[in-house]
Curated annotation (Swiss-Prot):
SUPFAM superfamilies: Actin-like ATPase domain (SSF53067). It is found in: Cytoplasm. Pathway: Cofactor biosynthesis; coenzyme A biosynthesis; CoA from (R)-pantothenate: step 1/5. It catalyses: (R)-pantothenate + ATP = (R)-4'-phosphopantothenate + ADP + H(+). Its EC number is 2.7.1.33. Catalyzes the phosphorylation of pantothenate (Pan), the first step in CoA biosynthesis. This is Type II pantothenate kinase. One of its GO terms (cellular component) is cytosol. Keywords: ATP-binding, Coenzyme A biosynthesis, Cytoplasm, Kinase, Nucleotide-binding, Transferase. The active site is at E76. The keyword Transmembrane does not apply.
Length: 276
Protein backbone atom coordinates (compact mmCIF):
# COMPACT_ATOMS: atom_id res chain seq x y z
CA UNK A 1 0.00 0.00 0.00
CA UNK A 2 3.02 2.30 0.47
CA UNK A 3 3.29 2.72 -3.33
CA UNK A 4 -0.38 3.65 -3.69
CA UNK A 5 -2.22 6.96 -3.40
CA UNK A 6 -5.93 7.54 -2.91
CA UNK A 7 -7.30 10.73 -4.48
CA UNK A 8 -10.74 12.25 -4.02
CA UNK A 9 -11.09 14.93 -6.70
CA UNK A 10 -14.09 16.95 -5.56
CA UNK A 11 -15.80 19.98 -7.01
CA UNK A 12 -13.85 22.40 -4.81
CA UNK A 13 -11.08 20.43 -3.09
CA UNK A 14 -8.89 17.50 -4.05
CA UNK A 15 -7.88 15.34 -1.10
CA UNK A 16 -5.00 12.87 -1.16
CA UNK A 17 -4.47 9.96 1.26
CA UNK A 18 -1.21 7.99 1.41
CA UNK A 19 1.24 6.31 3.77
CA UNK A 20 4.20 8.46 4.80
CA UNK A 21 7.76 7.31 5.52
CA UNK A 22 6.70 6.13 8.99
CA UNK A 23 3.91 4.06 7.40
CA UNK A 24 1.32 6.36 8.94
CA UNK A 25 -1.80 7.54 7.17
CA UNK A 26 -1.21 11.10 5.93
CA UNK A 27 -3.17 13.64 3.91
CA UNK A 28 -2.69 16.49 1.47
CA UNK A 29 -5.29 18.94 0.23
CA UNK A 30 -5.40 21.20 -2.82
CA UNK A 31 -8.00 23.33 -4.54
CA UNK A 32 -9.27 21.27 -7.47
CA UNK A 33 -8.47 24.04 -9.94
CA UNK A 34 -4.81 23.92 -8.86
CA UNK A 35 -4.01 20.88 -10.98
CA UNK A 36 -0.40 21.93 -11.50
CA UNK A 37 0.19 21.86 -7.73
CA UNK A 38 -1.34 18.39 -7.53
CA UNK A 39 0.90 17.12 -10.34
CA UNK A 40 3.99 18.74 -8.77
CA UNK A 41 3.26 17.04 -5.44
CA UNK A 42 2.89 13.68 -7.14
CA UNK A 43 6.20 14.15 -8.98
CA UNK A 44 7.95 14.87 -5.67
CA UNK A 45 6.63 11.60 -4.25
CA UNK A 46 8.43 9.40 -6.74
CA UNK A 47 7.74 6.15 -4.87
CA UNK A 48 4.05 6.36 -5.62
CA UNK A 49 3.20 4.28 -8.69
CA UNK A 50 -0.51 3.53 -8.46
CA UNK A 51 -3.45 5.87 -7.94
CA UNK A 52 -7.02 5.05 -7.05
CA UNK A 53 -9.12 8.07 -7.90
CA UNK A 54 -12.70 9.03 -7.09
CA UNK A 55 -14.87 12.15 -7.02
CA UNK A 56 -16.65 14.44 -9.44
CA UNK A 57 -13.47 15.64 -11.14
CA UNK A 58 -11.85 12.19 -11.27
CA UNK A 59 -12.09 11.87 -15.06
CA UNK A 60 -10.54 15.28 -15.60
CA UNK A 61 -7.58 14.57 -13.34
CA UNK A 62 -7.21 11.04 -14.64
CA UNK A 63 -6.60 12.34 -18.16
CA UNK A 64 -3.64 14.35 -16.89
CA UNK A 65 -2.09 11.45 -14.97
CA UNK A 66 -2.83 8.37 -17.06
CA UNK A 67 0.52 8.39 -18.89
CA UNK A 68 2.55 8.38 -15.66
CA UNK A 69 0.59 6.16 -13.27
CA UNK A 70 -1.46 3.02 -13.12
CA UNK A 71 -4.91 4.38 -12.34
CA UNK A 72 -7.98 2.70 -10.87
CA UNK A 73 -11.26 4.60 -10.74
CA UNK A 74 -13.79 4.03 -7.95
CA UNK A 75 -17.39 5.11 -7.52
CA UNK A 76 -17.52 8.19 -5.29
CA UNK A 77 -19.88 6.88 -2.64
CA UNK A 78 -18.28 3.44 -2.51
CA UNK A 79 -14.98 5.16 -1.76
CA UNK A 80 -16.58 7.38 0.87
CA UNK A 81 -18.29 4.45 2.58
CA UNK A 82 -15.08 2.40 2.71
CA UNK A 83 -13.35 5.39 4.30
CA UNK A 84 -16.17 6.04 6.76
CA UNK A 85 -16.24 2.41 7.89
CA UNK A 86 -12.46 2.50 8.40
CA UNK A 87 -12.68 5.66 10.52
CA UNK A 88 -15.63 4.27 12.52
CA UNK A 89 -13.55 1.21 13.36
CA UNK A 90 -10.52 3.34 14.28
CA UNK A 91 -12.66 5.51 16.57
CA UNK A 92 -14.27 2.44 18.21
CA UNK A 93 -17.80 3.01 16.94
CA UNK A 94 -19.97 -0.08 16.43
CA UNK A 95 -22.61 1.28 14.07
CA UNK A 96 -23.97 -0.45 10.97
CA UNK A 97 -27.21 1.44 10.47
CA UNK A 98 -26.97 5.20 9.93
CA UNK A 99 -27.66 8.24 7.81
CA UNK A 100 -24.49 9.54 6.14
CA UNK A 101 -24.53 13.24 5.29
CA UNK A 102 -21.59 14.43 3.20
CA UNK A 103 -21.29 18.22 3.17
CA UNK A 104 -19.05 19.07 0.25
CA UNK A 105 -19.64 21.74 -2.37
CA UNK A 106 -23.25 20.61 -2.17
CA UNK A 107 -24.67 17.99 0.19
CA UNK A 108 -25.37 14.32 -0.46
CA UNK A 109 -27.34 12.15 1.96
CA UNK A 110 -27.31 8.33 2.03
CA UNK A 111 -29.04 5.68 4.09
CA UNK A 112 -26.58 2.94 5.09
CA UNK A 113 -27.61 -0.46 6.40
CA UNK A 114 -24.81 -3.00 6.84
CA UNK A 115 -23.30 -3.44 3.36
CA UNK A 116 -26.22 -1.82 1.56
CA UNK A 117 -26.72 1.85 0.84
CA UNK A 118 -29.36 3.98 -0.84
CA UNK A 119 -29.07 7.59 -1.87
CA UNK A 120 -31.81 9.29 0.12
CA UNK A 121 -31.37 12.68 -1.49
CA UNK A 122 -29.38 15.86 -1.21
CA UNK A 123 -29.34 19.59 -1.72
CA UNK A 124 -27.33 22.22 -3.54
CA UNK A 125 -26.86 23.90 -0.16
CA UNK A 126 -23.41 23.08 1.20
CA UNK A 127 -19.85 24.33 1.40
CA UNK A 128 -20.16 26.01 -1.97
CA UNK A 129 -23.11 27.98 -0.62
CA UNK A 130 -21.08 29.12 2.37
CA UNK A 131 -18.23 30.32 0.21
CA UNK A 132 -20.45 31.83 -2.49
CA UNK A 133 -22.55 33.86 -0.06
CA UNK A 134 -19.47 34.79 1.98
CA UNK A 135 -17.87 36.21 -1.17
CA UNK A 136 -21.03 38.07 -2.22
CA UNK A 137 -21.75 39.52 1.22
CA UNK A 138 -18.29 40.09 2.74
CA UNK A 139 -15.89 39.75 -0.21
CA UNK A 140 -13.96 36.94 1.51
CA UNK A 141 -12.83 34.27 -0.95
CA UNK A 142 -11.04 31.66 1.16
CA UNK A 143 -12.43 29.19 3.68
CA UNK A 144 -9.41 29.77 5.92
CA UNK A 145 -10.36 33.45 6.22
CA UNK A 146 -14.05 32.79 6.82
CA UNK A 147 -13.73 30.39 9.76
CA UNK A 148 -11.95 32.68 12.31
CA UNK A 149 -14.49 35.47 11.74
CA UNK A 150 -17.40 33.04 11.96
CA UNK A 151 -16.28 32.02 15.45
CA UNK A 152 -16.77 35.56 16.80
CA UNK A 153 -19.98 36.31 14.89
CA UNK A 154 -23.54 36.27 16.22
CA UNK A 155 -26.79 35.38 14.46
CA UNK A 156 -28.96 37.41 16.84
CA UNK A 157 -28.88 40.57 14.72
CA UNK A 158 -29.89 38.82 11.50
CA UNK A 159 -32.00 35.72 12.19
CA UNK A 160 -35.59 35.95 13.38
CA UNK A 161 -36.28 33.38 16.09
CA UNK A 162 -39.57 31.93 17.25
CA UNK A 163 -39.14 33.99 20.42
CA UNK A 164 -38.82 37.19 18.36
CA UNK A 165 -42.20 36.51 16.77
CA UNK A 166 -44.08 35.47 19.90
CA UNK A 167 -42.45 38.01 22.21
CA UNK A 168 -43.34 37.21 25.80
CA UNK A 169 -46.23 34.95 24.80
CA UNK A 170 -45.84 31.20 25.26
CA UNK A 171 -44.99 29.68 21.87
CA UNK A 172 -45.89 26.15 20.70
CA UNK A 173 -42.22 25.36 19.96
CA UNK A 174 -38.82 26.30 21.40
CA UNK A 175 -38.26 30.08 21.37
CA UNK A 176 -34.62 29.63 20.30
CA UNK A 177 -35.48 27.94 17.00
CA UNK A 178 -34.94 29.91 13.81
CA UNK A 179 -38.13 31.24 12.24
CA UNK A 180 -36.36 33.02 9.37
CA UNK A 181 -32.70 32.98 8.36
CA UNK A 182 -31.56 36.58 7.67
CA UNK A 183 -35.13 37.73 8.33
CA UNK A 184 -34.13 40.73 10.45
CA UNK A 185 -32.03 42.17 7.62
CA UNK A 186 -35.25 42.88 5.71
CA UNK A 187 -37.45 44.10 8.53
CA UNK A 188 -35.49 46.25 10.97
CA UNK A 189 -32.29 48.25 11.32
CA UNK A 190 -29.85 45.65 12.58
CA UNK A 191 -26.48 46.40 14.11
CA UNK A 192 -24.47 43.64 12.43
CA UNK A 193 -20.95 43.24 11.06
CA UNK A 194 -19.15 40.90 8.67
CA UNK A 195 -18.62 38.27 11.35
CA UNK A 196 -22.35 38.21 12.06
CA UNK A 197 -23.11 37.76 8.36
CA UNK A 198 -20.69 34.85 8.11
CA UNK A 199 -22.10 33.19 11.22
CA UNK A 200 -25.63 33.58 9.85
CA UNK A 201 -24.69 32.10 6.47
CA UNK A 202 -23.39 29.03 8.25
CA UNK A 203 -26.54 28.91 10.33
CA UNK A 204 -28.65 28.79 7.19
CA UNK A 205 -26.56 26.02 5.63
CA UNK A 206 -26.34 24.02 8.85
CA UNK A 207 -30.08 24.12 9.47
CA UNK A 208 -31.03 23.19 5.90
CA UNK A 209 -28.62 20.26 5.82
CA UNK A 210 -29.65 19.04 9.27
CA UNK A 211 -33.39 19.36 8.57
CA UNK A 212 -33.06 17.17 5.48
CA UNK A 213 -30.91 14.62 7.33
CA UNK A 214 -33.43 14.46 10.16
CA UNK A 215 -36.32 13.88 7.77
CA UNK A 216 -34.54 10.91 6.20
CA UNK A 217 -33.51 9.56 9.62
CA UNK A 218 -37.11 9.78 10.83
CA UNK A 219 -38.45 8.08 7.70
CA UNK A 220 -36.06 5.14 8.15
CA UNK A 221 -36.29 5.15 11.96
CA UNK A 222 -32.54 5.72 12.26
CA UNK A 223 -30.92 7.08 15.43
CA UNK A 224 -27.41 7.97 14.22
CA UNK A 225 -26.53 10.62 11.67
CA UNK A 226 -22.88 10.79 10.61
CA UNK A 227 -21.85 14.17 9.24
CA UNK A 228 -18.69 14.35 7.12
CA UNK A 229 -17.10 16.66 4.56
CA UNK A 230 -14.33 19.22 4.31
CA UNK A 231 -16.82 21.98 5.13
CA UNK A 232 -16.80 20.72 8.73
CA UNK A 233 -13.01 20.76 9.06
CA UNK A 234 -12.03 23.09 11.95
CA UNK A 235 -15.54 24.54 11.66
CA UNK A 236 -16.77 24.34 15.25
CA UNK A 237 -19.53 26.89 14.61
CA UNK A 238 -21.16 24.74 11.92
CA UNK A 239 -20.65 21.56 13.93
CA UNK A 240 -22.38 23.13 16.93
CA UNK A 241 -25.37 24.23 14.83
CA UNK A 242 -25.76 20.76 13.34
CA UNK A 243 -25.18 18.99 16.64
CA UNK A 244 -27.68 21.03 18.67
CA UNK A 245 -30.42 20.76 16.03
CA UNK A 246 -29.87 17.00 15.64
CA UNK A 247 -29.99 16.42 19.39
CA UNK A 248 -33.08 18.62 19.70
CA UNK A 249 -34.85 16.11 17.45
CA UNK A 250 -33.61 13.21 19.60
CA UNK A 251 -31.10 11.90 17.08
CA UNK A 252 -27.40 11.26 17.65
CA UNK A 253 -24.91 13.35 15.62
CA UNK A 254 -21.46 11.94 14.93
CA UNK A 255 -18.54 13.93 13.54
CA UNK A 256 -15.59 11.79 12.46
CA UNK A 257 -12.01 12.94 12.73
CA UNK A 258 -10.65 13.09 9.17
CA UNK A 259 -14.21 12.57 7.90
CA UNK A 260 -13.48 15.07 5.14
CA UNK A 261 -10.81 12.68 3.85
CA UNK A 262 -13.05 9.60 3.85
CA UNK A 263 -13.25 9.45 0.04
CA UNK A 264 -9.47 9.57 -0.35
CA UNK A 265 -9.02 7.02 2.45
CA UNK A 266 -11.54 4.72 0.82
CA UNK A 267 -9.79 5.00 -2.54
CA UNK A 268 -6.46 4.13 -0.91
CA UNK A 269 -7.92 1.15 0.97
CA UNK A 270 -9.79 -0.14 -2.08
CA UNK A 271 -6.52 -0.86 -3.89
CA UNK A 272 -4.79 -2.12 -0.74
CA UNK A 273 -7.61 -4.59 -0.03
CA UNK A 274 -7.40 -5.92 -3.58
CA UNK A 275 -3.67 -6.54 -3.20
CA UNK A 276 -4.02 -8.35 0.13
Amino acid sequence: MESTIGIDAGGTLTKIAYLNEKMQLAFEKFYSNEQNKIIDWLKQNTGKKQICITGGKAKQLQQLLSNSYKIVELNEFEATLIGVRYILKEEKYDINNFILTNIGTGTSIHYVYNDQYIRAGGTGVGGGTIMGLSKLLTNLEHFEDVIPLTKVGSRKELDITVGDIYGGILSPIDNSLTASNFGKAATIESNYNSSDILATVQGLVGEVVTALSLQFAETKNIDHIIYIGSTLCNNIHLQNIISSYTKYQNKIPIFLQDGGNSGAIGALLHVANKKS
